[in-house]
Amino acid sequence: YRRHFGPTYYAFDMGHTHYIVLDDIIYHGAKKYEEQIDSMQLRWAAAYARRLPAGSRVCVAMHAPAMKSWLGNRVMESAVPLMEAFAGHDLHFITGHTHLNSNFDIREGVIEHNVAQICGNLWWDPINWDGTPKGYQLFRECGGEFSWEYRNLGEFPARQIRLWGPGEVAKHPACAVAKVWNWDPHWTVVWY
């Protein structure tokens, strides 16, 4: 890849948003790897951050998530100096790897969009393991506003929820379960 295309980290601007792509998989061979950002990329990203006007919107795209909600909201060690470098900016992480779809506030001014797989659960199941259908995340910038929407393949964009009745979800047999693909902590949920 590097020989033909160049570094595995780079940046570009689209509209008023600055996008940074980082390689946060350090491969050791024999299917062994670490989920971290190496020091060379961290230095490069910090230098890039210093050139941006205060309050800029920045999206950092990388494979593994910056925060692992299933491990008590543990933040990737190398993501901490990255967030510090972009302090004072509107920072969004766009990540994958987990086969689920979620949006988390990591800290003030930092949101992570962990996007489910477009292939579902590794091609053999059209639903990711958290109930999100196979699809993709659409990020939009319009009039200075930034928004995101999950698009499930083969269904209308307005469909953003799947419901299971009591007895259909083994982990919660007495409950009705709702999976809203793109819920985030800023939504207001109203039960009727």
Which residues fall in each region the model found?
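Extended active-site neighborhood of metal-dependent phosphoesterases/phosphodiesterases
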Residues: 1-54, 73-94, 100-142, 146-149
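Short beta-strand/turn micro-motifs composed of small residues
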Residues: 23, 62, 180
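Short acidic, glycine-rich surface-loop motifs adjacent to enzyme active sites
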Residues: 49-70
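Active-site glycine-centered loops adjacent to acidic/histidine catalytic or metal-binding residues
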Residues: 63, 96-97
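Alpha-helix capping/helix-boundary segments
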Residues: 66, 99-100
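Short, compositionally biased P/S/T/A/G/V-rich stretches that sit at domain boundaries
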Residues: 142-174
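Short edge beta-strand/loop segments characteristic of extracellular beta-sandwich folds
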Residues: 174-183
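Short beta-strand elements bearing conserved aromatic residues within extracellular beta-rich modules
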Residues: 188-191
